Amino acid sequence: MGFDVAGYLQSYSLKDWIRIIVYVGGYMLIRPYLMKLGAKIQEREHRKSLLEGEVDGTLDPEMTHGTKPKEHGEFDTDDEEEEENPDAEFRWGYSARRRIRKQREEYFKNQDKSPLDAYADDDEDIEEHLED
């Protein structure tokens, strides 16, 4: 139940062989010109992207979230006015940023309390066992 290649090739007429040779030869002749044209278009697009601010063909990650770029020293987790942006194509890491923001708030809230304040109530428990 195999494919008979020899029989298949013998069934080609002279017209079919000439047609194949014309297609393959035409492709071989036109291909270098198509490659040069593609290189020119690619170079033009690369130059255009460099002028727009993209570096080495990579997109700014903030562009994928649809937000403005952060200034030096700002963290993505501190962005409290972040709203759902329907125009944003990607929402990678949104839950993680929200979780870290919540942890950071808890940490700073607990920093206001002194560890000595937690042990102040322990003296009351011990006083009943102490003798004057």
UniProtKB/Swiss-Prot annotation:
InterPro entries: Trafficking_Pga2 (IPR011431). It is a single-pass membrane protein. Keywords: Endoplasmic reticulum, Membrane, Nucleus, Phosphoprotein, Transmembrane, Transmembrane helix. GO terms for cellular component: endoplasmic reticulum; endoplasmic reticulum membrane; nuclear membrane. It is found in: Endoplasmic reticulum membrane; Nucleus membrane. Residues 76-87, 119-132 have a biased composition (Acidic residues). Residues 50-90, 106-132 are annotated as: Disordered. GO terms for biological process: intracellular protein transport; protein transport; vesicle-mediated transport. Residues 62-75, 106-115 have a biased composition (Basic and acidic residues). The chain crosses the membrane at residues 17-34. The modification Phosphothreonine is found at residue 77. Belongs to the PGA2 family. PANTHER family: PROCESSING OF GAS1 AND ALP PROTEIN 2. Involved processing and trafficking glycosylated proteins. This is PGA2-homolog C27.01c. It comes from Schizosaccharomyces pombe (strain 972 / ATCC 24843).
